[in-house]
């Protein structure tokens, strides 16, 4: 809503909207008037969205690029099932998990202050050679795994390998559930139903959005069955 209002005001005043300015205004309004710390890259996603492409963000440099969608003129699609969960219902848990992940990554960064997380020796973490507790190790491993999966998906998109795209999506969802322990009964139920549907090759819970979603890689012919 904030993005829409920001763009509408620019149009109403006859101004040419500068994307970075609109994003900053939306971010500040969310914080000042709603006490919400909204991710700026999500606002940029909405402002830069183009039909037929995905956005791949580089969180290290704050840059992004468009990646052509492999689903154009294909018999597969990414389907979204809306959980219709009241946003307030999960807000507290999402904040708690966000702070938990942030604290874990900061603990890891302090061990190798001179090395960027992008070049972090993940093998040392997996082999338990670093003095961190098990919870921190598990969370950090998932963050690195998620980053690598995003790069893998870019390659799979180029290859139009829908089955492997579905498997990668399921891997992310499984990590959220098992390693971050972020769950929601309603969304878990929708995700489980998708796996049981013939023609669905993978799914993951997506907590961004009004009521939570389940994203699925599915054959178009399987929509009705789901």
Give short role names for the model-derived ranges.
Residues 50-204, 216-226:
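C-terminal nucleotide
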Residues 1-5, 199-215:
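Glycine/serine-rich anion-binding loops at beta->alpha junctions
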Residues 2-6, 38-41, 146, 150, ...:
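Short alpha-helical patches at coil-to-helix transitions and adjacent helical residues
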